[in-house]
Design a protein with these regions (language model features):
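Glycine-rich, basic loop-to-helix element that forms the pyrophosphate-binding segment
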Residues: 1-17
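Short aromatic/hydrophobic "clamp" motif used to bind/position activated sugar donors
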Residues: 22
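Catalytic metal- and UDP-sugar-binding loop of GT-A-like glycosyltransferases, i.e.
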Residues: 25-27
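Conserved donor NDP-sugar-binding/catalytic core segment of glycosyltransferases
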Residues: 29-71
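A short, conserved alpha-helix in the catalytic core of glycosyltransferases
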Residues: 33-40, 91, 95-115, 120-151
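C-terminal, non-catalytic tails of nucleotide-sugar-dependent glycosyltransferases
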Residues: 50, 60-61, 73-95, 100, ...
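A short, glycine/small-residue-rich beta-strand->loop->alpha-helix junction that serves as a flexible
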Residues: 217-229
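N-terminal strand-loop element at the rim of the active site
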Residues: 241-269, 273-276
Length: 290
C-alpha cells in the first residue's frame, strides 16, 4: 500500500467506518482529558450541528486556532493564533467558518451524504474549509468546542514552506480552487478591508443581533432568585436568536456557572483587565452591538 496523502487516506479509511460518527485526528497531535467526550456531547446536544472541532494548541501552550475565519476575498485566519489560550474570547461554543482538519468530528451519515473530502484538493490543504462549506450547504452548522483541547505539532507532517517541495506548496494552489468553488458563498462572508475587525467573523454572527448583559456576577442560578431570573433571560435571548455576551461586575470566571454559560454559546467577559478594558472593547465594537 502507498501513502496517498492526507485527503485520500482519510477518504479511504472513512469507508470502513461503521460507527455513528467519523473522527479525524492528525498523527502529529496529543489529546487531553475529555477531548472526545466534549465533542460528542456537543454534537448530540443540537440536531442543527453537523460538524464539531477542537481548540488547537501549540506544544508551548500558545493558541494555534479557536476556529477558522474565511473572509470575502477567500483569505483565511487561524483565529487567535499565538495568543493566550485562556482568554475569554476563545472559550465559548460558537459557530465558525471552518475548523482545521487536525481534529474534527461529524456523523458518518453526513460524511457519506457529502461524499467525503473533495478530491480536487488532494493531496492536502483547504479540504477542511471546503468540508465546512459543504456541511452548511447540507443545512447544518459547523461549531467550535473549546473544552476539546488538542495539542498540534503543526508543520511536522507536511513541512512549513509554502513555496517549497513539501505538501505545504499545495496551500496556495488549493486556496485558489476554494475561492473558485465557493465564490458565490464568499460574497456573504465578512469583508477583509486590510485590517478587519473579527468581532462578527469569528462566530459567524453576520446579520444577527448582539446583546451585552451586565450583572453583578455570573448567575449562580441554583442558589438565588435573582441569578435564576438572569439565567432565564439569557436562555430567552439565545432562543430568540441573539448572540449573547455577559459581563459580571466582579470580572470573575466562576465555576461551574461560567462553563455552563460558555457551553450554551455565551461569551463571558472575565479577567481583571476588563475593569478598564471594557470601555475600549465597547468603543471598538459599539457599531456591532444592538
Amino acid at each position: 500500500q502507498t501513502n496517498q496523502g492526507f485527503l485520500r487516506n482519510c477518504n479511504q479509511a472513512a469507508k470502513a467506518a461503521r460507527g455513528k460518527y467519523v473522527m479525524f485526528l492528525n498523527n502529529d497531535t496529543q489529546v487531553t482529558e475529555g477531548w472526545l467526550s466534549s465533542l460528542v456531547n456537543l454534537i448530540e446536544s443540537d440536531s442543527t450541528i453537523g460538524m464539531v472541532g477542537s481548540k488547537l494548541v501549540y506544544p508551548d501552550g500558545r493558541l494555534q486556532e479557536a476556529g477558522g475565519i474565511i473572509w470575502n476575498d477567500g483569505s483565511g485566519w487561524n483565529y487567535g493564533r499565538l495568543d493566550d489560550t485562556d482568554k475569554a474570547k476563545y472559550n465559548y461554543v460558537k459557530d465558525v467558518d471552518y475548523i482545521s482538519g487536525a481534529a474534527i468530528l461529524l456523523s458518518t451519515a453526513l460524511w457519506k451524504q457529502i461524499g467525503g473530502f473533495d478530491e480536487r484538493f488532494a493531496p492536502a490543504y483547504c479540504e477542511d474549509s471546503d468540508l465546512a462549506f459543504e456541511v452548511r450547504k447540507a443545512g447544518y452548522r459547523v461549531v467550535y468546542q473549546p473544552k476539546s483541547k488538542v495539542i498540534h505539532f503543526e508543520g511536522i507532517s507536511n513541512g512549513t514552506d509554502g513555496n517549497g517541495t513539501g505538501l505545504k506548496r499545495y496551500q496556495v494552489e488549493n486556496s485558489e480552487k476554494l475561492k473558485e468553488k465557493w465564490k458565490e458563498e464568499f460574497k456573504n462572508q465578512c469583508v477583509n478591508n486590510g485590517n478587519p475587525n473579527p468581532f462578527r467573523a469569528r462566530e459567524r454572527s453576520m446579520g444577527k443581533k448582539i446583546i451585552v448583559v451586565i450583572d453583578h456576577y455570573v448567575p449562580t442560578f441554583d442558589k438565588d432568585a435573582g441569578s435564576k431570573t438572569t439565567y432565564q433571560y439569557l436562555k430567552m435571548f439565545l432562543k430568540k436568536g441573539y448572540v449573547v455576551k455577559f459581563l459580571g461586575d466582579n470580572f470573575l470566571h466562576e465555576e461551574p456557572y461560567s462553563t455552563t454559560l460558555q457551553q450554551m454559546g455565551i461569551e463571558i467577559l472575565y479577567g481583571d483587565h476588563w475593569a478598564t478594558g471594557i470601555w475600549d472593547w465597547l468603543k471598538l465594537n459599539k457599531d456591532e452591538i444592538d
